[in-house]
Amino acid sequence: MGIRKVNPTSAGRRFQTYATFEELSNVEPEKSLLEPLRRSGGRNASGRVTSWHRGGGHKRRYRIIDFKRNKENIPATVASIEYDPNRSSHIALLKYADGEKRYIIAPVGLSVGDTVLTGAEADIKPGNCLRLANMPLGTIIHNVELKPGKGGQLARSAGSSIQLIAKEGTHAILRLPSSEMRMVPISCKATVGQVGNIDHENLSLGKAGRKRWLGKRPHVRGVAMNPVDHPMGGGEGRSSGGRHPCTPWGVPTKGYRTRKSKRSDKLIVHRRK
């Protein structure tokens, strides 16, 4: 994917950059794999805001993605590489030999006409899916399962990848994008390769309006609020009241650990930095 700069004909366009999308196919999305997507605006079932800074944005339809890759030993051909408004990565439409169609996350190097396969006999090439037990050490992977059969959960965003470091008994040791080293059952599946659309992080939106098109609302600082809205609100001038940075509910932030202990902690070999 290339990045295109626009002429600075206005303040909003001065730093704008766009993706060129030359690797995408000029086709309509597969209708059988589309679902209506209703927006919540960050509200829960009772109508209260539980996730701030969400709302608005362009109307979308959800693309059903095959994260489980459970159609084994049936070859599939890549019919198209498409844009997905619901994620930073691109998606690939697969047509299986038996006629079924499915979307998967498109890795780097996958192009229209390529053949992909799921199973123990699959080659180590981008787009193929195998169990960790069948992969050589050092393999770069994405869409990795945490529990066998649950579907890929790790490394699904644009440009992300995981490296298979070691195998010990019933578990494999992975190096995650956060630099965390974690053990995962060796029977879990993963897809070979790095997630595509690597230049996504280099895009500059250029203006607040493009952020709103994505469904993201303004992020207001606590010190800019009134005392009734935030512990750091109010005061004369830019004062924080003398307390350390915290959330609207008084929980310390900026480095404060909030992760609760859980049984799966024993699977973490080395915590992220």
UniProtKB/Swiss-Prot annotation:
<keyword id="KW-0689">Ribosomal protein</keyword>
<dbReference type="InterPro" id="IPR022666">
    <property type="entry name" value="Ribosomal_uL2_RNA-bd_dom"/>
</dbReference>
<comment type="similarity">
    <text>Belongs to the universal ribosomal protein uL2 family.</text>
</comment>
<dbReference type="InterPro" id="IPR014722">
    <property type="entry name" value="Rib_uL2_dom2"/>
</dbReference>
<protein>
    <recommendedName>
        <fullName>Large ribosomal subunit protein uL2</fullName>
    </recommendedName>
</protein>
<dbReference type="InterPro" id="IPR012340">
    <property type="entry name" value="NA-bd_OB-fold"/>
</dbReference>
<dbReference type="GO" id="GO:0016740">
    <property type="term" value="F:transferase activity"/>
</dbReference>
<dbReference type="InterPro" id="IPR002171">
    <property type="entry name" value="Ribosomal_uL2"/>
</dbReference>
<dbReference type="GO" id="GO:0002181">
    <property type="term" value="P:cytoplasmic translation"/>
</dbReference>
<keyword id="KW-0687">Ribonucleoprotein</keyword>
<comment type="subunit">
    <text>Part of the 50S ribosomal subunit. Forms a bridge to the 30S subunit in the 70S ribosome.</text>
</comment>
<dbReference type="Pfam" id="PF00181">
    <property type="entry name" value="Ribosomal_L2"/>
</dbReference>
<dbReference type="Pfam" id="PF03947">
    <property type="entry name" value="Ribosomal_L2_C"/>
</dbReference>
<dbReference type="GO" id="GO:0003735">
    <property type="term" value="F:structural constituent of ribosome"/>
</dbReference>
<keyword id="KW-0694">RNA-binding</keyword>
<dbReference type="GO" id="GO:0015934">
    <property type="term" value="C:large ribosomal subunit"/>
</dbReference>
<dbReference type="InterPro" id="IPR008991">
    <property type="entry name" value="Translation_prot_SH3-like_sf"/>
</dbReference>
<feature type="compositionally biased region" description="Basic and acidic residues">
    <location>
        <begin position="264"/>
        <end position="273"/>
    </location>
</feature>
<comment type="function">
    <text>One of the primary rRNA binding proteins. Required for association of the 30S and 50S subunits to form the 70S ribosome, for tRNA binding and peptide bond formation. It has been suggested to have peptidyltransferase activity; this is somewhat controversial. Makes several contacts with the 16S rRNA in the 70S ribosome.</text>
</comment>
<feature type="region of interest" description="Disordered">
    <location>
        <begin position="222"/>
        <end position="273"/>
    </location>
</feature>
<dbReference type="InterPro" id="IPR014726">
    <property type="entry name" value="Ribosomal_uL2_dom3"/>
</dbReference>
<dbReference type="InterPro" id="IPR022669">
    <property type="entry name" value="Ribosomal_uL2_C"/>
</dbReference>
<dbReference type="InterPro" id="IPR005880">
    <property type="entry name" value="Ribosomal_uL2_bac/org-type"/>
</dbReference>
<keyword id="KW-0699">rRNA-binding</keyword>
<dbReference type="InterPro" id="IPR022671">
    <property type="entry name" value="Ribosomal_uL2_CS"/>
</dbReference>
<dbReference type="GO" id="GO:0019843">
    <property type="term" value="F:rRNA binding"/>
</dbReference>
